[in-house]
Structures are given as structure tokens and as C-alpha cells.
Amino acid sequence: PRSTLFPYTPLFRSRSTEQLVDTLVLAKKLNGLLHHDIAVYSIEPVAADLHARFSALSRTYRYYVHTRKDPFLCAYSLELHYQLDYTLMNEAGRILMEYDDFGAFCKAGSDVKTTLCHVTHAQWYQTSPTTWYFEITANRFLRNMVRAVVGTLVEVGRGRMTLDDFRQVIEGKQRTQAGESMPAKALFLEDVSY
């Protein structure tokens, strides 16, 4: 998996559009204030009406797992103590793209207006003999959705759930039927497209 350097695009609004700012100086000053886990690499102007959340066309998340104890991965990847069938899990990922309603993967008790999302990509990738990541792209995500999807895919990969069962979970739209929500430490926002 990648190191702790993940690109992310926060957006800030200025009170004055007249004022020009030296972006290199601003980036340096922000880096002096930010926690060591966060870094600003560049600052670019955007349209005044752009909204960081609502103007996004798609988002891509990655969830990292590893199967051998590794002190360099433990903070940002989930260590699994069992073998998974990643081919079968990728088949389940393709099934995800056939659906638009993901109520089964929404955090219980969420007060969302809709559970509709358009998933355009869902696949596991192997980066070494013992490390993998799941990448998923959609126009939007529900709260806890990616972690619940990964937990359900792990059930498929362990042979505890068939592909037909996986379809029934999605179609049933009940969070209690899906797999467990995996720990947040291994989930990263990889990209936002505008």
C-alpha cells in the first residue's frame, strides 16, 4: 500500500476574491500549522460556486488489508488471519455495479434521504504476496458504506456467503444481513473528481 501520503483536496473560501495570495507562501504557512500527518502540496483557485462535497462527480476509496504481521502496515491496513478468495470477491464486486440501492450497507439509524448510489468500479488489487486493497468508485457513498461492503466481501471471500447470498443482501436492503463493518484505520479517500 501507499505510505501515509494520500492526495486530498480540501476547499477553502476566501472572504475577498480581489486579494491575490502567493500560494507557495500560503502552503508553507499552512504546513507550519498542520499536524505532521497532514501536508499541503499545492493550492489552486477554483470557481466561487464550487462546493467540496456537493460539486464532486465521483469519489474513490481504497481499503487496505494484509495477511502477514507487519509493523509498518498495522496503522493503515487491516491484518487478516485467514485466506480469502479474491477472485470470488471480485465477482461480488462486479455484482455491486449492477445495483443502485445500497441500503444494506448504510449505517443503521442513519437519517439519509436516499440510499441510491451509482458504483462504477469495485475491485480488489494485489500489491504483494501478502497485501491487497479494495478500490471502489461511485458518485456518492452512504455513511459506513465502504467498510460494510468490505466486511460483506470478506464473508464472500471466506466462503461464508455465496454470490447468490450477496445479491440477496443487496436486494434485502437490511444492514443486519450484510457483513460486519471493518475498522476505519484501513480506509482512505483516494480521489475526488470534479
Annotated model-derived regions:
Residues 1-10:
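Single conserved hydrophobic/aromatic residue that forms the stacking wall/gate
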Residues 12-194:
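Structured-RNA-binding interfaces characteristic of tRNA pseudouridine synthases
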